[in-house]
């Protein structure tokens, strides 16, 4: 499995991917999921993939090399929309070629793609491409896309990231999101590829491969866990024995719906409730047993 995230901000774009693939606990490998298509001063595009590795690699190769009947390729299209369309066509090409053989072996055609970047004077744009080759574009209401194991790292992004977030803030948030995923899912793993793109530069602004020795990421992992525990411990525990509305910590409900749903025992079973007896300590149970 894998986890990749792309963010579109007013200042530019941030991309982060892991590099783990696995086909079982004893078949774990490292394959980089991020590819860069760059012609400095003219265009800079990033493609990240999740899903079946052979499908992903085939799509990436077609995107890099294919020129259509109109002479268009990822290297010369005039807009990011057309770039996303070329990626979608590559997905369909691989599907047409491989899907039946995969299905005959019981393997689904499974791939998800994030592609984003900037071409010429056009604004930065970010797309997610699906297994059918169709795609959607991010907007201010949805400033990021995730593929792969997305659920663990989603909450922090939803709470923190807006179009006005800085590139450094977004990079930090992406790393925290990845740390949450690494903590909860062993199918995602180091090293990570982090790329930061500043709008208008038309070249990679910053790039780093992060392994277990990276001091900043180690600080993120330690500090984030400690701060979460600190915030949790400093929050008040719920209060149960006060009237509703008299204390902000009260969990008591004013609503009559605040009761459990109790099921009715079938009448033919009668009353089988056992009489309650005081709880005994283990020592008392042993002592009572010796009296028999």
Language-model regions: role of each:
Residues 1-292:
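N-terminal nucleophile
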């Amino acid at each position: 499995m894998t986890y990749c995230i792309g963010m579109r901000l007013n200042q530019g774009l941030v991309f982060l991917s892991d590099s783990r693939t696995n086909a079982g606990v004893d078949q774990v490998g490292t394959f980089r999921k991020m590819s860069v298509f760059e012609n400095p001063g003219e265009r800079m595009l990033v493609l990240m993939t999740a899903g079946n590795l052979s499908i992903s690699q085939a799509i990436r190769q077609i995107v890099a090399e294919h020129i259509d009947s109109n002479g268009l390729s990822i290297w010369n299209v005039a807009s990011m929309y057309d770039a996303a369309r070329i990626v979608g066509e590559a997905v369909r090409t691989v599907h047409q070629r491989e899907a039946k053989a995969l299905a005959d072996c019981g393997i689904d055609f499974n791939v998800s793609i994030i592609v984003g970047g900037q071409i010429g004077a056009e604004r930065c744009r970010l797309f997610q491409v699906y297994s059918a080759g169709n795609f959607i574009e991010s907007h201010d209401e949805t400033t990021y896309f995730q593929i792969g194991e997305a659920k663990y790292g989603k909450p922090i992004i939803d709470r923190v990231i807006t179009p006005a977030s800085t590139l450094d803030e977004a990079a930090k948030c992406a790393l925290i999101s990845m740390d949450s995923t690494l903590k909860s899912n062993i199918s995602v793993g180091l090293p990570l590829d982090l790329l930061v793109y500043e709008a208008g530069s038309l070249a990679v602004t910053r790039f780093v491969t992060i392994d277990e020795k990276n001091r900043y990421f180690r600080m993120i992992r330690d500090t984030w866990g400690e701060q979460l525990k600190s915030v949790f411990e400093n929050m008040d525990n719920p209060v149960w024995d006060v009237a509703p509305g008299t204390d902000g910590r009260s969990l008591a409900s004013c609503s009559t719906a605040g009761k459990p749903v109790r099921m009715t025992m079938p009448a033919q079973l009668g009353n089988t409730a056992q009489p309650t007896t005081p709880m005994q300590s283990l020592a008392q149970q042993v002592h009572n047993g010796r009296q028999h």
